[in-house]
From Swiss-Prot:
<keyword id="KW-0732">Signal</keyword>
<feature type="transmembrane region" description="Helical; Name=2">
    <location>
        <begin position="94"/>
        <end position="114"/>
    </location>
</feature>
<feature type="transmembrane region" description="Helical; Name=1">
    <location>
        <begin position="31"/>
        <end position="51"/>
    </location>
</feature>
<keyword id="KW-0812">Transmembrane</keyword>
<dbReference type="GO" id="GO:0016020">
    <property type="term" value="C:membrane"/>
</dbReference>
<keyword id="KW-0472">Membrane</keyword>
<protein>
    <recommendedName>
        <fullName>Putative uncharacterized membrane protein YEL018C-A</fullName>
    </recommendedName>
</protein>
<feature type="transmembrane region" description="Helical; Name=3">
    <location>
        <begin position="136"/>
        <end position="156"/>
    </location>
</feature>
<keyword id="KW-1133">Transmembrane helix</keyword>
<feature type="signal peptide">
    <location>
        <begin position="1"/>
        <end position="22"/>
    </location>
</feature>
Length: 177
């Protein structure tokens, strides 16, 4: 299966109300459902949450959790987050997006990349910038030619912890299948 892959490096504030770029919806406080009790944690979260709050987790807990609130634009996705004690290890997020959202996603890929550069250069928060980007949605109406025959967007987000305690450095791979 052929596809187009876009790689983005983004600095994501750990804000529980930060709207997701792909789905355009906000996230309620996570509700975690523990299943096991071992020395690491795996968490499933809705794509509306591109953040993690370490205070939710105990040092020796393993849990699989999910946010039940659906995205307003019906963007099915899940995230797998691996913790070891209190240390954040990695997160992989997989999203499937309906094809009619591709015009938004394509330009948001570029906007997220630019915003990440601004954040890294000037150490500013993305919360206000996120609101500005969301107001640009009405002008994102023209799909790129290479997306016209596509039906799904596959996003794989891999996050690693950075030096600050309130943000995550993430690597997003967008595959248009």
């Amino acid at each position: 299966m052929c596809g187009v892959v876009v790689v983005i490096v983004a600095l994501v504030p750990a804000d529980p109300l930060l709207p997701a770029f792909a789905c355009g919806c906000s996230c309620d406080a996570p509700v975690f459902i523990p299943f096991f009790n071992i020395s690491s944690s795996i968490i499933l979260i809705c794509s509306t949450c591109v953040f993690l709050n370490r205070s939710y987790f105990s040092s020796r807990s393993f849990s699989i959790s999910c946010i039940s609130k659906p995205c307003r634009l019906s963007c099915p996705s899940f995230s797998v987050v691996l913790y070891s004690g209190n240390k954040f290890l990695t997160m992989v997020r997989i999203s499937l997006m309906p094809s009619f959202l591709f015009p938004f996603a394509t330009l948001l890929c570029l906007l997220k990349f630019v915003s990440s550069l601004i954040s890294k250069l000037f150490c500013i928060s993305l919360v206000n910038l996120t609101s500005d980007i969301r107001r640009l949605f009405p002008i994102m109406l023209i799909p790129p030619p290479f997306l016209t025959s596509s039906s799904f967007l596959l996003e794989i987000k891999v996050c690693i912890s950075c030096n600050t305690t309130n943000s995550l450095t993430s690597l997003s791979i967008y595959a248009f299948l």
